[in-house]
Amino acid sequence: MLTRKQFELLKFINERLKEAGVPPSFDEMKDALDLRSKSGIHRLITALEERGFIRRLPNRARAIEVIKLPDLGGNTGGGRRGFTPSVIEGTLGKVRPPSHSHAEDESDRNVAVPVMGRIAAGTPIEALQTRSHTISVPPDMLGSGEHYALEVRGDSMVEAGILDGDMALIQRNESAETGDIVVALIDEEEATLKRFRRRGASIALEPANAAYEVRILPPNRVRIQGKLIGLYRKY
């Protein structure tokens, strides 16, 4: 049995994974549960991990995956059966393992997403014409629109569960809402993956790592090139 706070945190993490493809930061968890400090979040996460509901990736800061949800039946909270993590695992690009009888059909329906390079300073997305390879992604992971993948380099987003070496799945988009994690092109030179927020007339590009500073820029220096919709990770 989970306590109310444990269930609320598990539900919040799961919903954020489904919506954004990455887990919330500890500060976001603290605010969502109306706790005064992050130490309470640490205790709740430890309890959820001990009970087998989540997994923290070893040697990776605050990278969390939901392993299962409680079978709540008619209880409040709307638990779902058959849950699997939102992060795509391994090299097959499966979000949820298909039943044996439908395995081949599921594989045939997967979408080949082009890997357009690395998300690092120096190269605008449009200039990356050579596609190194593709990754196979379930169509329900993508939704509508045009998509591409970028290899993440660096640790500036680790507290959002985005790790060095991950493949970021990006939906092409020229606009963003506050809180979205976006591919932003700065001064037509530097591409970066950061959380987008508006601060008055300016744009804030926020890292998810206390070692990095928030960048505050005027809108004419920032061009949105896509929004993060998920991650492809090899183990």
From Swiss-Prot:
EC number annotated for this UniProt entry: 3.4.21.88
Gene Ontology terms for molecular function: DNA binding; serine-type endopeptidase activity
DNA-binding region of this protein: 26-46
Keywords: Autocatalytic cleavage, DNA damage, DNA repair, DNA replication, DNA-binding, Hydrolase, Repressor, SOS response, Transcription, Transcription regulation
Catalytic activity, as annotated: Hydrolysis of Ala-|-Gly bond in repressor LexA
Domain of life: Bacteria
Residues marked Cleavage (site): 121-122
Known function: Represses a number of genes involved in the response to DNA damage (SOS response), including recA and lexA. In the presence of single-stranded DNA, RecA interacts with LexA causing an autocatalytic cleavage which disrupts the DNA-binding part of LexA, leading to derepression of the SOS regulon and eventually DNA repair.
Family (UniProt): Belongs to the peptidase S24 family.
Protein name from the UniProt record: LexA repressor
Organism name: Rhodopseudomonas palustris (strain BisB5)
Gene name tied to this protein: lexA
